[in-house]
């Protein structure tokens, strides 16, 4: 977007007197994205504004605003804080926390984290989302671009608002669930969020996508337990009948995995054959691959070809 297309900065400044140091950092269609600082507490924030008459392009309809206002009232260590949602002048806007941590889309800049840390990160986000699911608010747009990772291994932070609710699976890329891409589900469900968190966990554990890893279970690539394999494979099962029904079940199994994260040493495990047999539906202890679970996702193009491809998709455009 050229400078001539941007909203006048004096107009933005006058409409948002609670902010200072406002800087335009990107755009997506009619939506413009600014970084700024809250005057009240000096917190770094991100301001997203869309002309109200065009807000429907992104799904920013009255129902979206009502859901977002509910999110503003929530506070959890696994969720980025959403400070304000509403209308100002001709714009509909969202003001959210903007921490200085790298995004999961840029995780190659961070050192490898332990299985325990990866499990804790995803559990923390899952627990935060559960507070919203209990109010029948489902994200439906989780991607690595919306997940911040602290370099010190602390809590992951997920932006709890689906910024482009009208546009998945295009903007979600490989994190869109199979049922959303195929049209089997036309509204957001808990399972869609679970699928995205499960895929995030696989990548955090292995630094690979399932396809890059030949559909191997995490324990075939790193030292982790069967409990870790079980939680990951069930979360990303493309069959919604076999996937976790709710985040509570996922969190329960994550807790089991956190209690016993270590397992066999991946170096001592022979690599899976080039033509692995399709395992039975219910994962057995020690099973070495997730081939069965991901074949349907591969057919509809859900499983990412590579993490490099995924990152390129996620970082294309703007924040």
Give a label for each model feature.
Residues 121-122:
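Activation segment signature within eukaryotic-like protein kinase domains
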Residues 127-137:
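Protein kinase catalytic-loop region centered on the HRD/HxD motif
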Residues 36-62:
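ATP-binding glycine-rich loop module of kinase domains
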Residues 81-91:
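Short beta-strand micro-motifs within the conserved protein kinase catalytic domain, predominantly
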Residues 104-113:
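AlphaC helix of the protein kinase catalytic domain
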Residues 171-265:
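C-terminal lobe helix-coil module of Hanks-type protein kinase domains
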């Amino acid at each position: 977007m050229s400078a001539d297309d941007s909203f006048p900065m004096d107009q933005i400044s006058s409409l948002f007197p609670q902010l200072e140091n406002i800087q335009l950092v990107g755009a997506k269609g009619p939506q413009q994205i600014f970084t700024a600082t809250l005057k009240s507490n000096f917190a770094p924030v991100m301001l997203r504004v869309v002309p109200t008459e065009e807000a429907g392009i992104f799904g920013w309809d009255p129902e979206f605003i009502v859901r977002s206002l509910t999110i503003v009232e929530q506070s959890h260590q696994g969720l980025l804080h959403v400070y304000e949602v509403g209308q100002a002048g001709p714009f509909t806007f969202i003001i959210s926390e903007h921490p200085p941590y790298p995004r999961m889309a840029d995780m190659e800049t961070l050192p490898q984290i332990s299985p325990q840390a990866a499990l804790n990160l995803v559990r923390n986000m899952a627990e935060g989302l559960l507070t919203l699911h209990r109010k029948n608010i489902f994200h439906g747009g989780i991607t690595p671009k919306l997940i911040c990772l602290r370099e010190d291994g602390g809590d992951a932070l997920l932006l709890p608002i689906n910024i482009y609710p009208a546009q998945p699976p295009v903007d979600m890329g490989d994190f869109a669930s199979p049922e959303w891409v195929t049209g089997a589900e036309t509204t957001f469900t808990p399972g869609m969020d679970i699928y995205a968190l499960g895929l995030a966990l696989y990548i955090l554990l292995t630094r690979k996508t399932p396809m890059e890893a030949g559909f191997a279970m995490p324990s075939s690539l790193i030292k982790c337990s069967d409990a870790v394999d079980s939680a990951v494979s069930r979360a990303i099962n493309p069959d919604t009948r076999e996937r976790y029904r709710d985040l509570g079940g996922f969190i329960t199994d994550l807790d089991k995995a956190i209690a016993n994260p270590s397992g066999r040493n991946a170096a001592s495990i022979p690599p899976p054959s080039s033509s692995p047999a399709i395992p039975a539906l219910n994962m057995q202890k020690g099973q070495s691959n997730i081939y069965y679970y991901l074949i349907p996702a591969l057919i509809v193009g859900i499983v990412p070809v590579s993490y490099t491809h995924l990152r390129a998709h996620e970082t294309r455009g703007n924040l």
